[in-house]
Regions:
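Phosphate/diphosphate ligand-binding glycine-rich loop within oxidoreductases
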Residues: 2-144
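Residues in the short beta-alpha loop(s) of Rossmann-like NAD(P)-binding domains
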Residues: 15, 198-199, 259
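Short glycine-rich anion-binding loops that position phosphate/pyrophosphate groups of nucleotides
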Residues: 83-90, 177, 229-232, 259
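NAD(P)-binding Rossmann-fold cofactor-contacting core
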Residues: 187-208
Length: 298
């Protein structure tokens, strides 16, 4: 696709009204046009293009093709979109190609729209940047545990820091975000289990740690990652069922929900002494990675 003076990006999912992505991408757009102005020796007061980030609330994907056809016909081209719950896996059959990470995880959160130069038909390529986002979050936790930084330097981390890096992890949920979390934990050789609807459905590298269940004690120095949308605005009082009484100051907890900033899940963990973090840092880092992908295709 030729360089676009004006373009659009967006987010599909349900619900999406709470999303902070428009704010994040507005900063990316500003940086993009500042760079374009310097290249073209123009001031920002001159017209060098526009960019918008739209929220598309799609409860399901039955009308996805019709939605896409409508959007790509608009004057300002839709060059890509992000994908959030509940469509990170469901979107795959609608795509033409997957990046290696997206193919491995069978989960997509970033889609680039390319166009066949002959037919002008859209060609959709799915990527996964959640892996990068959670990787950065885990690096922050490890940095705290190794005392290479102070907790005040870590965005959205609350409670007294735990000075031992996670030795075990429990993933709550089994959606697209959970797949990215599991992948990163495996790359770091951190034994992990996936809990979904009150059952242990997946356990990895368990020779390094005794298998645990909802009815047994959670090991010390465990990391609990809440990947479901439970507790997300506007249902801020909702909380996933979890044996919080087993937590203490040796535990870490990350809730990938970022609105509200302190979820009901996080409050329960804090009350038990665990160190917690919300999903804002992961959101920012996965968005930066997604923007790099979009920017390469402008």
């Amino acid at each position: 696709m030729p360089k676009q003076k004006s373009f659009r990006l967006g987010l599909i999912g349900h619900p999406v009204s709470h999303s902070k992505s428009p704010e994040i991408f507005a900063k990316f757009f500003e940086q993009h046009f500042q760079a374009q102005a310097q290249i073209n020796s123009k001031s920002l007061s001159e017209h060098i293009g526009t960019a918008d980030y739209h929220l598309f609330d799609l409860p399901d994907l039955t009308q996805f093709n019709a939605w896409l056809e409508c959007e790509i016909k608009k004057p300002s081209p839709l060059v890509g979109f992000n994908v959030t719950v509940p469509h990170k896996t469901a979107i795959i059959p609608y795509l033409d190609e997957l990046s290696p990470a997206a193919h491995h995880l069978q989960a997509v959160n970033t889609v680039v729209i390319q166009y066949n130069t002959n037919t002008q038909k859209p060609y959709l390529v799915g990527h996964n940047t959640d892996v990068i986002g959670f990787e950065k979050s885990l690096e922050q936790i490890i940095a705290i545990s190794l005392s290479t930084t102070t907790q005040n330097d870590i965005p959205d981390a609350l409670n007294s820091p735990n000075h031992v890096s996670p030795q075990f992890a429990i993933i709550l949920g089994n959606g697209g975000s959970a797949k990215a979390v599991r992948y990163v934990l495996n790359q770091h050789h951190i034994p992990n289990q996936t809990w979904h609807r009150g059952k242990v459905i997946n356990q990895i590298d368990m020779q390094l740690s005794e298998a645990i269940s909802l009815n047994t004690s959670i090991p010390h120095h465990a990391l609990i990652v809440q990947t479901t949308p439970v507790g997300m605005w506007p249902n801020t009082e909702d909380c996933i069922d979890f044996p919080f009484e087993q937590l203490n100051h040796t535990h870490w907890a990350i809730d990938l929900v970022y609105n509200p900033e302190t979820t009901a899940f996080m409050k329960h963990c804090i009350n038990q002494g665990a160190t917690v973090m919300n999903g804002k840092y992961m959101l920012q880092k996965q968005a930066e990675a997604a923007w790099e992908i979009f920017h390469q295709n402008l």
